[in-house]
Amino acid sequence: MEEAYRQARKRGEQGRRRAISQSEHPYLTDLDSLVAQLPCGQRENIGLRDIPLEMVVGTVTKGRQSAFSCNFMPLLPWNTEFARKWSNLYDIQISEGYRDPIIVTEFMHRFYVQEGNKRVSVLKFLDAPTVSAKVTRLYPGKWDSVESRLYGEFCAFWYVCPLYEIEFSREGSYEMLAKMLGQDLVEKWPQKKVDYLRHTFLLFKRAYLRAGGDHLDITPADAMLVYLNVYNQDRLLDTPTDIVVNRLCKIWRELVIAGKNDEDKVDLVEAPSVDEEESPAKSTSGMLNFFMGKTVYSAANPLRIAFIHEFPCATSSWDSLHDQGRQYLDEHFGGIVRTEAFEDCHDPDVFYAAVETAVKHGANVIFSTSHRLMEYTLRAAVEYPRVRFLNCSIGLPHQSVRSYFGKMYEAKFLLGALAASMADNHRIGYHASVFASGALSEINAFAIGASLLDPRAQIILTWGDVPAGGLAEAMCREGVSVMTGVDMSKSLEDPTAYGLHRLVDGKVAGIAMPVWNWGRYYELIVRSLLHGTWDETADDQQVRAVNYWYGMSSGVIDIRYAPGLPYQTRKLVQLLRNGIVEGSINPFGGELHSQDGVVQIEGFPPLPSTQIVEMNWLADNVVGTIPQLDDEPKVRAL
C-alpha cells in the first residue's frame, strides 16, 4: 500500500518537474478558472457513462488542484490524511473494484472531476482505460472558433454514435468517417455498428501506438482516417496487428503530412526548372546526344511510363487528350522514353491489375489521369514505393503521390473578358458541372475578366450536367446571349458542350475554348526525371506533398479562337494573354470584392497560390451560390 503510493508520488513529481521545464502548468487544470475566461452556454445531463481516463484532465474547482500533478499523480507526503485515503482507495480497487461512479463535467471533449479525484488518480496509476462517471456536459457560449466548431461536430457524432474515444483535429472528419461506414450524423447508428467502430478503433489505436504514433501531431482517430483512405476495403478487426503496424510504416509520411497546418502540407511547383525548360529539339546533335551525360536512361534502358485512364479514349475526350499527350512523349523523346496505356480502369480491381501489369513491364512512372483515380493511386503508391506515381488533380496533400494540374483560371480570365465584349445585355452565363478544388478560382477569374470590359456585367452561375445539345436551351432559359460551358465534353460527339458560345438565331455558335496541352505538360515532368531534378523538387527533411501547377507561361494552358472572330477582339485578348504570360497581369491582384464584401483593398499583391486553389468565395458580380456538400453529389478535388 505504502509502496504503491510512493511510486505514484514519484510519477507525480516527475510529471510536475517535466511540466515546469516545458513552461507548462505543473498542477491539474481547474474548470472554474478555465470557463471564467470563456463564454459558456447551457448544461446538459448526459447520465451515467464509461469515459476514457486519458480524457479526464482536471478538477472542477481549485480545492484539490495542488494535491495532484498535471498527470493526476499525487504530490502530498506519505504521512498525510490524503495519502492514507488514496492508499485505502488503492486497496479497494485491487481487491474488489469501485462500485460508485465519479461525478464529472464535460467541456470541449475533456472531463473535469467534481467528485472522485483520488479514485481517478488511483485508476490512472493502474493504467485503467475507463471509469464510470455521471456526466454533465457544458456547452461553449460561442461556436466561432475552430475548436468550438470541432466540438460541435463531435457532439453531432456523439448523439448518433456515443463514443468519446473518437477525437479528430480536422473539421469534416466525423462526417467523412460516417460515410466510410455507410452512416450519417442524423440517424442513430445501429448498436452493432457502434460496437464495431469501438472495437476497430481500439485495435487500430494499439497498433498505431506500437508503431510510434504518439510522436506524431495527430490523434489516433486522425491516423485511422488516413489509414482507411488507403486500405478502405480491409476490415481492421480481421487484420493481424503486425500487418496493421507494417501498413502504418508504409504510409508514415502520409501521417506526418496529416499533422501539418494546411499551409505547410503542399509545395505548389508553379514553373519548371531551367533544365526542364531547355528544349532538346534545339540540339544540333539530336535527341539522344542532348541527354547524353545528363540521364541514366537510354534507348537500351528507357524510362518506362504507364498511363492509366478512367474511361476508354474512344468515348472520353478527357482521356483522349491525355493519351495524345502520352503519344507525344513517345515521338518527342526518340526512344529514351517508352509508354503504354491502360484504358477503362474506373473499377478498382481493373485499376490494380493495370498497375501490377505496368510494374511487371518495368514501369518507372505511372500517371493516373483522373482525380477520381486518386484513392486507387494512393494505395498503389504505398504498395510499390519504388515506382513514382502522379495523379491529375490539385489540392490533395499526399506525399506518396504527386499531383499535377493547370492554372485554368488564367484561360477563364481571358474568356470572361471576351464574353463581356460580345454580350448583348450585361448578362453572361457560366455553367459548371462539378464543384471542385480550383472551380471557384475559375469562376471568379472569369467574372473579374468580364468586369474589366463591362463593369455592369453579371455572371449567371449554374451547376449540373447539360444534356447533349442542350446548351442553347440553357442559354434561353437563363436569358443570356453568351455562355461558357464545361471545360471538356464527356462525349466526343458533342463539341458544343464546352467552351465559350453565343446564341445566334436560336443556334449555338462557338467563340473560343480553353485548351489543355498535355503533351507539353508531360514533357516538362518527364524532363525532370531524365535530368535527375525530380528529387530536388521535394525536401526529404520537410515531408510535404508536391503539386505541379503550371499555367500559360509554361505552355500547358491556352485558348483557341473560333474562325471568324474579329481581329480587334483577338488583339484585345492577346494583350491580356501576354500580360499573364509575362506576369504583369494577375486576376487576383489588387482590389477584390466577394458577394460578402471586400476581400482585399487596392494596392495589395496577388493572392497567394494556396488561397487561389482553396478559394471559398464568389466575386460580387456573380449571381449564384456555392453548392453545399450534401446538395452537390459531384463535389470533388480536381
Question: What is each PLM-predicted segment?
Answer:
Residues 326, 414-457, 540-563:
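An alpha-beta-alpha
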Residues 1-118, 125, 170-182, 190, ...:
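Short, charged/polar connector segments at secondary-structure boundaries
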Residues 382-405:
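Flexible loop/hinge segments that line or gate small-molecule binding clefts
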Residues 107, 114-179:
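Glycine- and acidic-residue-rich phosphate-binding/metal-coordinating active-site segment common to enzymes
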Residues 306-324, 329, 342-348, 436-440:
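Extracytoplasmic "Venus flytrap"
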Residues 404-426, 515-536:
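Hydrophobic alpha-helical segments within soluble ligand-binding/sensing domains
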Residues 362-371, 390-392, 480-489, 508-516, ...:
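Periplasmic-binding protein-like
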